[in-house]
Amino acid sequence: MTAQLIDGNALSRQLRTEVAQRAALLRARGITPGLAVVLVGDNPASQVYVRNKVKACEDNGLHSVLERYPAEMSEADLLARVEALNNDPAIHGILVQLPLPAHIDAQKVIEAISPAKDVDGFHVGSAGALMVGQPGFWPCTPYGCMKMLESIGYDLRGKHAVVIGRSNIVGKPMALMLLQKNATVTICHSATADLKAMTLQADVIVAAVGKRNVLRADMVKPGAVVIDVGMNRNEEGKLCGDVDFDGVKEVAGYITPVPGGVGPMTITMLLVNTLEAAERG
């Protein structure tokens, strides 16, 4: 068996077409959805991510503002900028690119963002809304994973889903989203005694730890759906995920590639969240 690919690029194009159409309807009413992206410092990876987010906005009818600041920027000054953006009616979503310089408390900055503009879904208010099933902004990466499962018509009810990783950005919210769809969810992490025993029971596996080959073919039951959130580089410098793709694709029923899987979906769901923030207005 060779797994079917869940193509994140193709799904992203489809969803971005819908975003552009909805953005055009808003613009016809005099509302241009606006995203502010704040970058502190000169982390090369962050600069690439930020450029991609700004370009995605421009390509799909959203207004974007990129604010760049030196790594020496004080926490107080950054908090003041966030507050100014909170009060700017032309801005519907605010994204502060992580990681921040060590002298700035990232969680404090995240909490300073108005929950109504928290399109990254990292605010405790957004996390709480997800926990109790209330409307709010879902973190973009797990939200994208859910859209990928939806795209293949996968019914999670009664299925066993294993999430490898427990970060606030992916692992924990991913587990809650799967739970909302009536999956039975197991979260695995660095202290899990026997990861293979857990994953072999799984109908769905989401790998999100940032470690190459954390999931191998002998750890996957035939026909399972494998979502690879990881973004790593191999010895040749090529992008790869957390999953041993070549091995696992011979066992799984569905699998996401890296690159071209979850990555483009993350930015697409940021656009969706920003659009929804503007629609809620």
Curated annotation (Swiss-Prot):
Pfam families on file: THF_DHG_CYH, THF_DHG_CYH_C
GO biological process: L-histidine biosynthetic process; methionine biosynthetic process; purine nucleotide biosynthetic process; tetrahydrofolate interconversion
The protein's Enzyme Commission number: 1.5.1.5, 3.5.4.9
Pathway: One-carbon metabolism; tetrahydrofolate interconversion
GO CC annotations, alphabetized: cytosol
Keyword set, alphabetical order: Amino-acid biosynthesis, Histidine biosynthesis, Hydrolase, Methionine biosynthesis, Multifunctional enzyme, NADP, One-carbon metabolism, Oxidoreductase, Purine biosynthesis
GO molecular function terms noted in the UniProt entry: methenyltetrahydrofolate cyclohydrolase activity; methylenetetrahydrofolate dehydrogenase (NADP+) activity
Disulfide bonds: none
Transmembrane parts of this sequence: none
Residues annotated as binding NADP(+): G165, R166, S167, S190
Gene3D superfamilies reported in the protein's UniProt record: Leucine Dehydrogenase, chain A, domain 1, NAD(P)-binding Rossmann-like Domain
Catalytic activity, reaction form: (6R)-5,10-methylene-5,6,7,8-tetrahydrofolate + NADP(+) = (6R)-5,10-methenyltetrahydrofolate + NADPH; (6R)-5,10-methenyltetrahydrofolate + H2O = (6R)-10-formyltetrahydrofolate + H(+)
Assembly, per entry: Homodimer.
Family to which this protein belongs: Belongs to the tetrahydrofolate dehydrogenase/cyclohydrolase family.
Role of this protein: Catalyzes the oxidation of 5,10-methylenetetrahydrofolate to 5,10-methenyltetrahydrofolate and then the hydrolysis of 5,10-methenyltetrahydrofolate to 10-formyltetrahydrofolate.
Identification of the protein by name: Bifunctional protein FolD
Source organism of this protein record: Polaromonas naphthalenivorans (strain CJ2)
Lineage of origin: Bacteria, Pseudomonadati, Pseudomonadota, Betaproteobacteria, Burkholderiales
